[in-house]
Amino acid sequence: MSSEAIKKFLDGFSVEVTPKAASKIENFEDYIPSGTLVYIAHIEGTPIDEMVETAKKINDQGFCAMPHFPARIIKDKNVLEDWISRYKNEANVSNALLIAGGANKPYGEYDSSIQLIESELFDKADFNNLHIAGHPEGSMDIDPDGSTTNVDQALSWKNEFSKRTDANMAITTQFSFDASSVISWANNIKEAGIDIPVHIGIAGPAKLQTLLRYSIECGVGASIKIIQKRAMDLTKLLLPYKPTNIITELATYKSNNPSFNIEKVHFFPLGGIKQVSDFVKEAC
């Protein structure tokens, strides 16, 4: 696989940070290209003040902040409207990732990203980019029976919404380690009529123990087996994981199938943003 194809596949990649991680980064330009899309994870319990402050820092440094809006921790429409207003007016934010969120039960009236969309507040605030979640390996949280029925129905609804909104939409997925399952999922949703572009989630370089912990927490079942198999190989146990194989396989497939619906790579820097930066430089 040529480095040129990998470079093209990684062009325009995005990263994700928490306010805590962002507070330790003095200058984002030391690690990522100017203009990079930076998602801000809104972990349950994080004050909105910290989220807005982080978004402002990212935008002020010449990057594009995209905060998470987890439906289950938003009490009501007034709170949602306040968050949107603060992001817009205090941090110049016009991007959002709309998700259900990881809270076990809703704080108030919202339980899904569809309800956030139905509020129409993002369109009224002229948000330019609205991204939604994708689940290449399904989601036990959404489909406890192990099927993809609810996930598929929600994605179909959001696809119809994408035709009505002025905002640009994309599907940002949970991370995976298995290229074949990602390719199969991406092709399946395209065949089902979903024409929203996909930004595929990729775990950045990290220790195997870290990957296993996050994989279990995020419920990426098929991928856990891949990491466990690697951990059983004593020659690789002490070596940090790098997403070389999955990036190479996806870049190869994209090169051979230009209409493939995966358009961008979204890195989860589980081992740190510097490790992602170093990996991209090496890969390209």
Language-model segments: residues:
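Active-site beta->alpha loop and helix N-cap motifs at the rims of alpha/beta catalytic domains
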Residues: 2-153, 272
